[in-house]
């Protein structure tokens, strides 16, 4: 951003008093790194710490941020404020040092709320679909020439980053309900995509508490703000009468204000009509597969329509939508001639979905777009608590694929829960008689095991939220070919 654009921005976004140096603990996370990137581009001095380098930290280093790959008290030297990821514990040395030095320690969402304070905020919340919906809305606003700032939880492929500082008053942000921190936000427009039981430890196992928290979030809107709510979701629909704000509903339902009809999928694209009250219908070509993505697009249409964005800009943005990282992310189509000698090819798709509903949506999109292909899934369960709480749902959903390779549970710091491990889940799926899962406890063996099960007309889904994305990238880089060491080790 040049000096003139920054001056224009300062006209409606004043600086944070005496704050000059902002330190992030856990800066490598997508959400944390995105906020840090926006603040770096606004001219603040940025530093941060994490355990290992990744694309987020490398991008921030290019912007001049000082990144430490350790957690030490001296890292916060001269910081005006310390921003802590929700994954950071209270006894972290940097947090302890900041409190002893009386430096304010805030959560990620509090800093996001500060970014939103003087802007026209659009916040996207819900159990599933937040990242993609945020990216779609950002793409439409950019197409319309509105140059928004956005902060997303995933890579926005068209921008090549998780976050971007725009010169306008618009801020489009993913809102995180996992720790209820989205209650810090005070947007002008809020989207609720859906609500399911997830992160229930935050809500003390009480689903009513979770629902009330979403209502409280919507009541952070000013009385003249707008809630955009998916009426297809039964829990969201149930909450509508309890929301005292202007509401626009969307979905496939006949009751929806912004309604999807005539949906068809051909390969990776969706074709459908969006009907809007008292406005011309939109014939949408969406460059993203699955009915779930049509719903995400309908939410984006509802937000854009409220802003007065033209139908032509909406359609152009959705047709050219490049997607987000690890959301049905097509990594290539690879020949198997040198993989297992069987010939043919295999498509490789990487997907972040780690809740049964998300996994089910990915499988359905794959079936609809490529009905002649076998679905070979490599799945890594994420957290023992989630596996325990949604055990039967996982077993039912995973039973839909043709071949299943199961990795060990990615613990995310949790202790092992007996009966909620991958071996138990494989045993349960096998007992149902349709599928014989293959447990691959050693990630280094995945490529070799995969080579043995491919038959030349497969769609490989690499599925999960842990470190399985590295496996997907490795498969793409090696074109699915196991190394000699893998073959020998496996043999």
From Swiss-Prot:
Extract the GO molecular function terms from the UniProt entry. Answer: ATP binding; UDP-N-acetylmuramate-L-alanine ligase activity
Look up keyword Cytoplasm and say if it applies: yes
**SUPFAM superfamilies from the xrefs?**
MurCD N-terminal domain, MurD-like peptide ligases, catalytic domain, MurD-like peptide ligases, peptide-binding domain
- Hey, which family's this protein in? Belongs to the MurCDEF family.
Gene Ontology biological process terms, A to Z: cell division; cell wall organization; peptidoglycan biosynthetic process; regulation of cell shape
The EC number(s) attached to this protein equal 6.3.2.8
By what name is this protein known?
A: UDP-N-acetylmuramate--L-alanine ligase
Annotated pathway? Cell wall biogenesis; peptidoglycan biosynthesis
Where ATP is bound, by residue?
A: 126-132
Its recorded reaction(s) are:
UDP-N-acetyl-alpha-D-muramate + L-alanine + ATP = UDP-N-acetyl-alpha-D-muramoyl-L-alanine + ADP + phosphate + H(+)
Which locations, inside or outside the cell, does it occupy?
Cytoplasm
- This protein's source sits in the domain of life called Bacteria
Q: Explain the purpose of this protein.
A: Cell wall formation.
Q: What class of enzyme is it?
A: ligase
Q: Name one GO cellular component term.
A: cytoplasm
The record's section on PANTHER family has: UDP-N-ACETYLMURAMATE--L-ALANINE LIGASE (PTHR43445:SF3), UDP-N-ACETYLMURAMATE--L-ALANINE LIGASE-RELATED (PTHR43445)
Keywords annotated in UniProt: ATP-binding, Cell cycle, Cell division, Cell shape, Cell wall biogenesis/degradation, Cytoplasm, Ligase, Nucleotide-binding, Peptidoglycan synthesis
